[in-house]
């Protein structure tokens, strides 16, 4: 699913919060099925990501239009996207804030990564067509595990 904002909430179990506009086709599917796959693309897919975000699944088949291929997920009915660096199978664990804030809380129940992608350059939406591309890693002292 295409979304422009998400946040890690917890690590054990992995919990993610995300905003999905109630105008989006995905919003109703997420409320009805209570599951999804968060697909994590790299910069090479940026044009397709914007295309998916600017169109509606009510009107077009995004997989066909943007030439994305799917694989079967193991825990949910939504498909994985083969071209993405990672796919996170999720189930909705809390939708109490969906009606007012479009905010869903998801538990990641299965994660997939492309092992051939050693240093993924993921993209992060800043709003209004602006993205940051991940790249440089810095390491600082930490007591976190």
Regions found by a protein language model. Give the residues of each.
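Basic, polyanion-binding surface patches
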Residues: 1-145
């Amino acid at each position: 699913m295409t979304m422009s904002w998400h946040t890690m909430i917890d690590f054990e179990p992995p919990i993610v919060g995300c905003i999905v506009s109630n105008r989006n086709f995905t919003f109703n599917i997420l409320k009805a099925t209570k599951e999804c796959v968060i697909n994590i693309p790299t910069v090479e897919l940026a044009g397709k990501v914007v295309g998916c975000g600017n169109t509606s699944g009510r009107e077009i088949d995004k997989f066909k239009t943007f030439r994305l291929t799917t694989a079967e997920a193991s825990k949910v009915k939504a498909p994985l996207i083969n071209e993405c660096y990672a796919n996170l199978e999720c189930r909705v664990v809390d939708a109490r804030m969906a009606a007012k804030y479009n905010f869903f809380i998801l538990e990641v129940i299965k994660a997939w990564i492309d092992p051939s992608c050693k240093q993924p350059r993921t993209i992060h939406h800043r709003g209004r067509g602006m993205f940051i591309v991940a790249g440089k890693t810095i390491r600082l002292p930490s007591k976190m595990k």
